[in-house]
């Protein structure tokens, strides 16, 4: 019996429609389980960061979303380190997508806008604590601007036949 390929799926900053498109090809996924194992996918499997830390190697990582926070960056770096192949899935991962439009505005305008519209209202802040939120990066980046990417599957979301071809490759 040949060893099953380990597949990871991760979504950074984006709308998660690319992940939904992957999940929507369920009628083909049953054949996938004969030769592949979904080893990390927070959206579908409820995987935690500790699950990723325990894995020695991943054969293929499908990374969706743009890099907008320090946690997005950390995930991209860790998944690249563990993955034999890194695939930028969708327009956000491939090009920055809609989240990347924020790069068109001066950063001070975006900072002021965020500070004005995000009044303190969390339970943590009511207790005098700071919420543990990821830090926003100065600019939104596409995946290839952070790590080496082996393949790009663009689209918003990518077409299902392209998704299935990428999975089978």
Task: Report residues per predicted region.
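Iron-sulfur-associated redox domains of electron-transfer enzymes in respiratory
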Residues: 1-169
């Amino acid at each position: 019996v040949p060893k099953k390929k380990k597949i990871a799926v991760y979504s950074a900053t984006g709308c998660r429609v690319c992940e939904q498109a992957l999940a929507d090809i369920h009628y083909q996924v049953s054949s996938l389980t004969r030769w592949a194992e979904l080893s990390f996918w927070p959206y579908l499997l409820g995987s935690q960061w500790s699950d990723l830390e325990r894995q020695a190697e991943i054969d293929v990582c499908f990374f969706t979303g743009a890099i907008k926070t320090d946690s997005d960056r950390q995930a991209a770096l860790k998944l690249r380190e563990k993955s034999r192949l890194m695939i930028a899935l969708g327009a956000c991962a491939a090009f920055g997508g809609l989240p990347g439009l924020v790069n068109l505005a001066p950063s001070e305008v975006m900072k002021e806008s965020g500070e004005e519209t995000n009044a303190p209202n969390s339970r943590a802040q009511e207790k005098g604590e700071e919420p543990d939120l990821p830090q926003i990066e100065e600019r939104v980046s596409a995946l290839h601007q952070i790590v080496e990417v082996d393949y790009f599957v663009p689209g918003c979301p990518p077409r299902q036949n392209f998704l299935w071809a990428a999975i089978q490759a």
